[in-house]
Amino acid sequence: MKRKGFIKQIFGVTADGRVEQLSELHIPAGTRVVQSFLISTLFEDNGASFKKVILPNSVKEIEHAAFANIRAEQVLFKNGLEKIDGYAFRGVGIRSENLVFPKTLKSIGHYAFAENRIPKFSQDNSLKKVTLPQNCEYYKDSFDPTTEVVGGKLIEE
């Protein structure tokens, strides 16, 4: 069965498995779901580092650990995104002072942005502040304890 809107291939990996140094990772337009472990499996072991990860407005969901442990200084979320599953961006090292999410975002899973530290300065939390739409549900552990969360609805467990 052919599934439309799923990433099938990412360019930038050489035939022998090395990653070409990419400054930006663009998820293809039309992609609706970034599957679990997809990006992290392709790039984590290769030491890839990106200035930006750019998601098109067609992406509705980012599944469990899709981007976990890759390096990306900035992630650009577009309107249309509704759900970020647990561990999706765990350990990514986003260096944004204020990460703003689209108004369409409804939920952020457990540990989605946890352990988001710059590797050279492991005690420094690089994600200082996040701004969520008022209707977006998140957990206390969705972000590191030192990250300021503005907006959203905290789910008490």
What is each residue range found by the language model?
Residues M1, G5, G17-V33, E44-E61, ...:
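Structural signature of tandem-repeat unit edges
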Residues F11-T14, Q35-S40, A66:
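Surface-exposed repetitive/solenoidal architectures
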